[in-house]
Curated annotation (Swiss-Prot):
GO terms for molecular function: NAD+ nucleosidase activity; NADP+ nucleosidase activity; nucleotide binding. It comes from Lachnospiraceae bacterium (strain RUG226). InterPro entries: CAP12/PCTIR_TIR_dom, Prok_STING. Residues 4-121 form the TIR domain. Its EC number is 3.2.2.5. It catalyses: NAD(+) + H2O = ADP-D-ribose + nicotinamide + H(+). It comes from the Bacteria. Forms homodimers; in the presence of c-di-GMP forms filaments with an ordered array of parallel-stacked subunits. This is CD-NTase-associated protein 12.
Amino acid sequence: MKTRIFIGSSSEGIDVAKRIKTFFAPEYDCFLWTDDIFRNNESFLETLVKSASLFDFGFMVFSADDKTTIRDQHFESPRDNVLFEYGLFLGRVGLDRAFVIAETDAKIPTDMLGITQTRYETIVNSKGIKVATDSLESSLQKLKKQIDENVQLGHLGLLPSTVIAISYFEGFVKLAAEWLVENTPELMINNHKFNKASLKIVMPESLDTDIKRSAMMYYKRHGLEEARIDTKHRNYPIHFASKTEDGILEVYDMPTILTGIDKAIDMYFRVGHIGKTNEQKLAEDHEMNNFKRVLQLLINEDAFCRECVEIIEPQP
């Protein structure tokens, strides 16, 4: 699951928006405001209000579309609605996640001069059409480094999945990893001795199904045995595969706590229907991706977890 980027612009700036999408597409899931992902009867304003629940980052293209006169001086400026929409998006997601990509000739309001901006130059081609030069991609390369860093550092939003990932890590993963590391070698489970152990966290394919039942089916399909472990804080049931001839223990866990995300999304969208809208599916994928990213960051910061914990996708 890739990090998601929303790209907004005026109608005149759509070609620039498409180039931005092409640039980031190899490593990010990019969506233009013109893409068919929102309800037909929903305004762009409503779309932006929901954007914080659907996307990780937002780009707004400030193309020089209008003429503005300020104190008898004439300037080219972005459309008023684009400025408003950026301000709304910024208020929803914050400076670390909302970015301006502006044409060099576009006059930006003085209140926004402190905001980091990515600039690009334009020329008029042989057909008399104003187009962005290669300076766009050069500037986007610098922006990408900033986005990549934000993702790697884990600039977290106040999403349900962030809280759930932290709870799952502190309440199970961290304790289980500590128990596995401290008790190996010479670890005994069900009368078998193991010299090496690992914890594999199995991400469910989606939130569409009953995760508890999906977990039970996964454990059964892979012939996993059941046992209990006594950590310093509580007793946990586990499912494991044993390679007794090699002395290797593999513990598997599918985080059923993710069911809470599905319920939170249903409440957010005030679900009164059967099935999933595109917006619900986007929100679910976004939350799943964020859960996995936050959990991986927490694993990377813990010495015991780095030693034995791995996040995996379900195997058929």
